[in-house]
């Protein structure tokens, strides 16, 4: 990143801090996850959960969703102004699973949002601790990225389902702040912008008046976030055009879709963070670990270490494969849904299979599912090695344009080639290079054509033994060059429905 000087690291975004040195960052990230852990322990006490029940990932998700809902100002305000039948705007809750007489039971709980907010603040030294909330949102987003496909959403905005690797963070709420913006993929930003432009086309007042002025500011801010993800001058120049448009319309949508396609080869920089379920932080705090004193990082060895020593359980449906369920959660924990499977498999130490071959549905259990036949098993979340998370797209030759893979956005900073079907991608760029962005389009296509799939990304970067916390001895894996490793290959996952 050329502009590193002006950017805050993503731990700083995560903790809302100003520029800090490495030690301060580690301490404030530690304070953040420690607060999540303390909150979780307190909730388990409130709900009288046994140790086993407190380690159940479904219970963790319910508790996380409750605190996110309790702090969702906008939605709370909306619910109070538009009362709907059977929904108390002041309460929040969800399913809690308990072990009774050798069976799993579902119990629906309801809490005052005010009470949840009080417990959360108490766990976070009396502060609102927005960073911790964002952290939980990103964990949920990473879980969705690994679990669901967004084909429908892509098609609806006129994009190609093959662009799924650009959709990281597509289910993050609007209020996820700078840390949320950092982990959104190029496709996610493009989709948000297209939705906005379409509203403007259908509703003449969208850009007008006092509200319209605010809308326009939001539009420009989103354009700048997307521009910051691109690494080539031509892509950035095109984003300036889109942002400065007086009255955004179909021309801008065309430009954005063109840019999204180009990102399959000229990849954007998208941050990756290992965000773990609240119960994992809770377990560590309960065992006496002091996160703030020890310091913590979302992009180094710490999450791997934490998962090495945590035992988390999950409910398993009758015909699901527990190993596959573990893979799903492992990928979510490391934000690796869009990583090359060759790299993930090497780090994890067991083969990571494409989603089309997984015999498992999502982690959450719907309220109409039969609990009688539910079983539970231990999630295997340990890894053989650890690697540093990246925020670059892995473009080679001086971080300019390089081979993308039609479906990879690297998570780990580990040397590999990025095989891609240039023919498949370039086929999407026939025709339209006229209009005001013609010279930029031509330049982008030229860069894409000169990209070579055999180029090596992250030259010399490797994985590390779990005993090597200072990252002194990189082990550079060698991969079978021909074998491309997309997780979405032969995909049959369910769609994400809100």
UniProtKB/Swiss-Prot annotation:
HAMAP family: INFV_NCAP. A motif (Unconventional nuclear localization signal) lies at residues 1-18. Keywords: Capsid protein, Helical capsid protein, Host nucleus, Host-virus interaction, Ribonucleoprotein, RNA-binding, Viral nucleoprotein, Viral penetration into host nucleus, Virion, Virus entry into host cell. It is found in: Virion; Host nucleus. A motif (Bipartite nuclear localization signal) lies at residues 198-216. Its main location: virion. It comes from Influenza A virus (strain A/Duck/Hokkaido/8/1980 H3N8). Encapsidates the negative strand viral RNA, protecting it from nucleases. The encapsidated genomic RNA is termed the ribonucleoprotein (RNP) and serves as template for transcription and replication. The RNP needs to be localized in the host nucleus to start an infectious cycle, but is too large to diffuse through the nuclear pore complex. NP comprises at least 2 nuclear localization signals that are responsible for the active RNP import into the nucleus through cellular importin alpha/beta pathway. InterPro entries: Flu_NP (IPR002141). This is Nucleoprotein. One of its GO terms (biological process) is symbiont entry into host cell. SUPFAM superfamilies: flu NP-like. Homomultimerizes to form the nucleocapsid. May bind host exportin-1/XPO1. Binds to viral genomic RNA. Protein-RNA contacts are mediated by a combination of electrostatic interactions between positively charged residues and the phosphate backbone and planar interactions between aromatic side chains and bases. Belongs to the influenza viruses nucleoprotein family. The keyword Ribonucleoprotein applies. One of its GO terms (molecular function) is structural molecule activity. Late in virus-infected cells, may be cleaved from a 56-kDa protein to a 53-kDa protein by a cellular caspase. This cleavage might be a marker for the onset of apoptosis in infected cells or have a specific function in virus host interaction. GO terms for cellular component: helical viral capsid; host cell; host cell nucleus; ribonucleoprotein complex; viral nucleocapsid. Residues 1-21 are annotated as: Disordered.
